[in-house]
Curated annotation (Swiss-Prot):
The modification Phosphoserine is found at residues 4, 38, 211. This is Aldo-keto reductase family 1 member A1. Keywords: Acetylation, Cell membrane, Cytoplasm, Lipid metabolism, Membrane, NADP, Oxidoreductase, Phosphoprotein. PANTHER family: ALDO/KETO REDUCTASE (PTHR11732). The modification N-acetylalanine is found at residue 2. The gene is AKR1A1. The modification N6-succinyllysine is found at residue 127. Disulfide bonds: none annotated. It is found in: Cytoplasm, Cytosol; Apical cell membrane.
């Protein structure tokens, strides 16, 4: 089953369901990509920081291109610029490393992963003696100008943002000659992001949801927090429609025209996650899922300081999650 697409302002078509690769083991991700392509996925979401772009590149080389499973022009590949590479001099070398690792000549979409910059260098998480992060003063508007040059060179087809708030999006738009096409943020029924989605849609940005199933497999999960996949409303709709809870959560997003990048390395789940285009929710069913919103954010980078878990970057002036949206 092929995923339906949304049209970006660049004219590109982005499939509404893509394969996420965050937390996918290098040893497992190659087979996962190959399987996903074989069952109709045409959108792969990557990032330099995930540490597995080389293996993804091997899968793409074997399966994408003339005479192979998928022609390159049918595939939509996203990657992301890491925080240590925001300095304008570091942007193109970072992209070229990603392209070399993925064995691609261009990316369909390149995102700035976070609004703030870490200290330049090869350590992905440069730290002070007390364990806190060492930041760099480069502003995302300077980074954006360097990203725009990549489009002019034909290395990237579209640019976007990840983990930016509404104010920061407008700040980028105020200087952009290449406007961002996509915002990628955490989004699921517990964190519906309605205001942020409306803000983006009014400005011609499409939204991609990461952790659309609630990311209950992450290492720092609080055992007390609610589990989206076990939410009674979700289970009831799954039973009613003869679907899995994951399919219910993904259908809710694609019906709102929000693209999703569920991560899996399990063939049965990879297949299940794209089988969400042959059923529809009524307006009442959509409202039931909308009503689950509690502005509950799961993905907040944390640090342990003096034995306590604290948000790693919350004190940074460009931290995105201190604003209402």
């Amino acid at each position: 089953m092929a995923a339906s697409c949304i049209l970006l302002h660049t004219g590109q078509k982005m499939p509404l369901i893509g394969l996420g690769t965050w937390k996918s083991d290098p040893g497992q991700v190659k087979a996962a990509i190959k399987y996903a392509l074989s069952v109709g996925y045409r959108h792969i979401d990557c990032a330099a920081i995930y540490g597995n772009e080389t293996e993804i590149g091997e899968a793409l080389k074997e399966n994408v291109g003339p005479g192979k499973l998928v022609p390159r022009e049918e595939l939509f590949v996203t990657s992301k610029l890491w925080n240590t590479k925001h300095h304008p001099e570091d942007v193109e070398p970072a992209l070229r490393k990603t392209l070399a690792d993925l064995q691609l000549e261009y990316l369909d979409l390149y995102l700035m992963h976070w609004p703030y910059a870490f200290e330049r260098g090869d350590s992905p998480f440069p730290k002070n003696a007390d364990g806190t992060i060492r930041y760099d003063s480069t502003h995302y508007k300077e980074t954006w100008r360097a990203l725009e040059a990549l489009v002019a060179k034909g290395l990237v087809r579209a640019l976007g943002l990840s983990n930016f708030n509404s104010r920061q999006i407008d700040d980028v738009l105020s200087v952009a000659s290449v406007r961002p096409a996509v915002l990628q943020v955490e989004c699921h029924p517990y964190l519906a992001q309605n205001e942020l989605i409306a803000h983006c849609q009014a400005r011609n940005l499409e939204v991609t949801a990461y952790s659309p199933l609630g990311s209950s497999d992450r290492a720092w999960r609080d055992p007390e927090e609610p589990v989206l996949l076990k939410e009674p409303v979700v289970l009831a709709l799954a039973e009613k429609h003869g679907r899995s809870p994951a399919q219910i959560l993904l259908r809710w997003q694609v019906q709102r025209k929000v693209s999703c990048i569920p991560k899996s390395v399990t063939p049965s789940r990879i297949l299940e996650n794209i089988q969400v285009f042959d059923f529809t929710f009524s307006p009442e069913e959509m409202k039931q899922l909308d009503a689950l919103n509690k502005n509950l954010r799961f993905i907040v980078p944390m640090l342990t300081v003096d034995g306590k878990r604290v948000p790693r970057d919350a004190g940074h002036p460009l931290y995105p999650f201190n604003d209402p949206y």
